[in-house]
Regions:
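Catalytic histidine site
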Residues: 1-51
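Short, conserved secondary-structure segments in the cores of folded domains
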Residues: 22, 92-96, 140, 146
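Active-site region of chymotrypsin-like
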Residues: 1-17, 80-88, 114-197
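Conserved active-site neighborhood of the chymotrypsin/trypsin-like protease fold
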Residues: 32-107, 112-115, 131-134, 191-197
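Short, solvent-exposed loop/turn motifs
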Residues: 20, 59-60, 157
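A glycine-centered beta-loop-beta connector
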Residues: 28-35, 101, 150-157
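Conserved beta-strand and immediately adjacent loop positions that scaffold enzyme active sites
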Residues: 21-22, 28, 51, 73-75, ...
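Short amphipathic beta-strand and strand-loop transition segments with alternating hydrophobic
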Residues: 24-28, 64-66, 126
Length: 198
């Protein structure tokens, strides 16, 4: 049930020659009827107030960047004209970092594939310069999954997927079952909402 619920909110955008993944969310307790897209900053990196086209099926809408953090790799886009056939997920962020061994689920557009739903577990944590503690998942990911929102078993937002692990010795190799996620605790949702309400 949760996988289907999540899939309905996933959007797609073709950026940087790869698919990119987005989630349509609605923080109802902050502003009724306000819809935004949560993604990775590196797939929406043209700066504040820049615009991107995001799609689901035959519907396409324009998203405006209202929050951008290169250090944490999180971006928030404001959707001015609502989608007609997509119901946004209620934004329920975790208040703490998910523990090792806990299950997760997400959907995304790896490589040139259509929407895929993937499960996994928290494997551990690493530090990222400028951002601090990151979540490492034991799951599957590939280029194009960047920006996917990770959910726990209760449907709460865990964080945003921003990278696939890599091995540099003795040669470069992508480790597609070790995935980097920035915890949602890094995002203060009041900041993008304040930008919109100015």
């Amino acid at each position: 049930y949760l996988n289907q619920y999540f899939r309905e909110s996933y959007l797609w955008s073709s950026l940087h020659h790869w698919n990119s993944s987005y989630n349509l969310l609605n923080p109802k307790r902050y502003k009724k009827g306000f819809h935004f897209v949560l993604t990775a900053q590196h797939v929406a990196d043209r700066g504040m107030a820049s615009t991107y086209l995001v799609s689901k099926g035959e519907e396409t809408r324009q998203g405006i960047v209202v929050y951008s953090s290169p250090a944490d790799d999180i971006a928030v886009l404001f959707i001015q004209e609502k989608f007609r056939n997509i119901e946004p997920i209620k934004y329920r962020p975790m208040k703490s970092i998910l523990e090792v061994g806990e299950p997760i689920a997400y959907s995304g557009y790896p490589s040139s594939h259509k929407l895929m739903s993937i499960r996994g577990r928290v494997a551990g944590y690493e530090d990222k310069h400028g951002s601090g503690q990151q979540i490492i998942l034991h799951t599957y990911g590939w280029f194009g999954c960047s920006g996917s929102v990770i959910f726990n078993k209760n449907g709460e937002v865990v964080g945003v997927l921003w990278g696939v692990d890599a091995e540099y010795y003795p040669s470069l190799a992508i480790v597609e079952d070790m995935i980097w996620v920035v915890p949602i605790t890094k995002l203060d949702i009041k900041k993008p909402i304040k930008t919109i309400c100015k």
